A protein has these predicted regions:
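Bacterial N-terminal signal peptides that target proteins for export
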Residues: 2-16
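Substrate-binding cleft and catalytic face of glycoside hydrolase catalytic domains
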Residues: 118-119, 157-162
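Structured, charged N-terminal subsegments at the starts of enzyme catalytic cores
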Residues: 129, 137, 141-152, 159
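Short, contiguous, well-structured surface segments enriched in hydrophobic/aromatic residues
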Residues: 151-154, 165-170
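A Lys/Arg-rich helix-loop hairpin that forms a DNA/phosphate-binding surface
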Residues: 173-179
């Protein structure tokens, strides 16, 4: 990978040192609290005592969006939770309008799909050349849809679902070599984002990507002669990760305990063995031809091959499917049985809440969302009914998450138990959208090909290291104030002594102008070597370059610049202490005068870097 552009040494040292202090400072200002980033081993300081827990919220408070779009800051906060990041034009246009109307309109927008984009990249692969431009196509389409897609709510929901129903092309194996499989899977999630979870599970089950990833593609019935048994991988994860978990939950997501005070396990390995028989006989609809090429087999659902289907009875979770039932009917009955389980609503609802609003949701919040999931219907604040009335309606569930009083209350802005560490990937997309970075030609964003390492973001779309995602939903960070309170904080699982400076360096690179400040010839050689395509200089030099016109106009006034970035990036959540620290740092980056454009650019890059590495920004509330 190319050596990244480095800003001036003075700016770099100022940014790196202050950003590290801000990011590791624990409780720097109003955004830190109990969800702040844990200190790395290099920082030696006694941990402050945890604050007294706040009083519990009233039982079943009414859902409300009073003022959601009433002010620019409120609009920005709502869009931060619901999209890949607000833009200034969206905030200006939506402020004073109805958040309910916006939500309803988002449900009607056509989906921005991935497969058509991948097919364009596939057509660009040179004959007898390296197929990398197609291999990376799932990444390119993700960036384009996330940053420039008109269907922001749908795209954000699809990404949230991708962290529950995990398929990954990490590791350079088949799913990396055949991007069509993952691209089709991306579209399965995108199309079903506002649909029904039961239907989504069915489409996921038949998808070649999941069939390959969890090893039930080509799954065969038992053979008593050889001792062969059906593969149990998908059956286990379908229950454990995708639907009900492993222990009995109450409607609020809290574990149900037995008479000895122990959690109640939901199933045994016999249940997994019985369920595994359901997922036999599935394979791609067509096998490779004599040349070893795969036609469009990865772009269609898998089909049943009767000779491989288990003819044994399938018993699990107190459900029974008779012997000699074909695969399609077995899958229908199995998914219906699983969806009827009372754990599905709280188990899935809590994880979706974590992806949008708060990492450690109050049990009452979970129960209200789970109620909408079970009912399949939710009434928006303007009275519009969302959902079909069938259990598992995802549009109703998402509405319940975003419009719940816990999410919309102004008190959440100062509640140290509410909120979440921003996912690193969402920090980048917010930056790109806030500053209108050019994502029309994502193939030229050579530094964005793999962000899964701690030296970048520790997170890359559809590239989790395992089916357990980038982080576990029940993760409690040891040695932190949130951990001392028993709070779940999944994103802290990828925060460590490597990822903290890695993120700082990453965001600095783009904040200071990214590829536009690099050596064109070196960049062009890298693109040509990696992708084997003719290089378009204009596209290369404009890829993901920010438009700082508004910021440059404020560059000579450090305080005004920081106030602007606070509103744009953090919906006014930066504390006075944090803003003062950043202004002081900016004033040490001198500007010779109104005509010092280089000095202005340096100051803007420094300001963006410091805001986006501050704990006030890193914790979303």
């Amino acid at each position: 990978m190319l050596q990244r552009f480095q800003p001036t040494r003075r700016a770099y040292l100022t940014t790196a040192s202050l950003a590290m202090l801000l990011a590791m400072g624990g409780c720097g200002g109003g955004g830190g609290g109990d969800n702040s980033l844990p200190a790395t081993p290099q920082v030696v300081a006694p941990p402050p005592p945890p604050p007294s827990p706040p009083p519990p919220p009233p039982t079943q408070p009414p859902s409300s969006s009073m003022g959601a779009f009433g002010t620019e800051l409120g609009t920005s906060r709502f869009l931060t939770q619901a999209t890949f990041g607000p833009t200034q034009s969206e905030v200006s246009a939506l402020t004073g309008t109805s958040a309910s109307a916006w939500f309803s309109a988002e449900l009607q927008k056509p989906a921005s799909l991935n497969v058509p984009q991948l097919q364009v990249y596939r057509s660009m692969v040179p004959e007898d050349g390296d197929p990398n431009i197609a291999v990376y196509g799932t990444t390119y389409s993700f960036w384009r849809n996330a940053i420039e897609g008109n269907d922001q709510l749908r795209q954000r929901m699809a990404f949230a679902l991708s962290q529950i129903l995990v398929v990954s092309n990490f590791g350079g194996e088949t799913l990396s070599d055949i991007p069509e499989a993952v691209s089709y899977y991306q579209d399965v999630l995108t199309r079903n984002a506002f649909g029904n979870y039961r239907n989504l599970l069915e489409d996921v089950t038949y998808s070649p990507a999941m069939g390959h990833y969890l090893t039930y593609m080509g799954n065969q019935k038992a053979d008593p002669v050889t001792g062969r048994m059906p593969d149990e991988n998908y059956a286990r994860e379908l229950l454990q990760l995708f639907t009900i978990g492993v222990i009995q939950l109450g409607p609020d997501g809290a574990p149900v305990l037995d008479a000895q005070g122990q959690p109640i396990e939901l199933y045994t390995n016999m249940d997994i063995t019985g369920l595994a028989r359901v997922f036999t006989g599935l394979n791609v609809f067509e096998f490779p031809d004599d040349n070893g090429s795969f036609p469009d087999v990865w772009l269609r659902p898998m089909v049943e091959y009767a000779d491989s289907v288990s003819d044994a009875p399938k018993q699990f979770l107190n459900c029974s499917i008779p012997g000699n039932t074909n695969t399609a009917d077995s899958i229908d009955q199995a998914l219906d049985c699983i969806m009827a389980h009372p754990n599905v609503a709280p188990f899935i609802s809590r994880q979706l809440i974590q992806r949008f609003t708060t990492s450690d949701p109050d049990p009452d919040y979970v129960q209200r969302v789970a109620t909408a999931f079970d009912a399949g219907r939710y009434s928006l604040p303007d009275g519009t009914a969302v959902g079909t009335g069938r259990k598992g309606d995802l549009s109703a569930t998402l509405a319940a998450i975003l419009f719940d009083s816990d999410a919309r209350s102004d008190s959440a802005l100062t509640d140290t138990r509410f909120g979440k560490v921003r996912e690193p990937l969402l920090r980048f997309t917010q930056w790109a959208r806030a500053f209108d970075a050019d994502a029309r030609y994502p193939e030229y964003g050579i530094e964005l090909l793999d962000l899964s390492e701690p030296s970048a973001l520790s997170q890359h779309p559809y590239r989790a290291r395992s089916v357990f995602n980038f982080y576990r939903p029940g993760y409690i960070a040891p040695g932190t104030r949130s951990g001392a309170l028993g709070m779940t904080a999944p994103e802290l699982q990828i925060v460590n002594a490597s990822s903290t400076p890695g993120y700082i360096n990453f965001i600095m690179y783009w904040a200071y102008g990214g590829q536009s400040r690099g050596d064109y010839n070196a960049l062009a050689q890298e693109v040509s070597r990696e992708l084997q395509i003719p290089v378009d200089r204009a596209k290369l030099e404009s890829a993901f370059v920010p438009n700082y016109a508004d910021e440059l106009a404020l560059a000579n006034d450090a305080a005004a610049l920081v106030d602007h970035l606070d509103r744009l990036l953090a919906y006014g959540s930066l504390s006075i202490e944090t803003k003062t620290s950043i202004v002081t740092a900016l004033e040490r980056s001198p500007i010779a005068g109104p005509g010092d454009t280089e000095g202005q650019r340096e100051r803007v890059g420094l300001a963006v870097s410091l805001v986006m590495t501050s704990p006030d920004y890193l914790v979303q509330r």
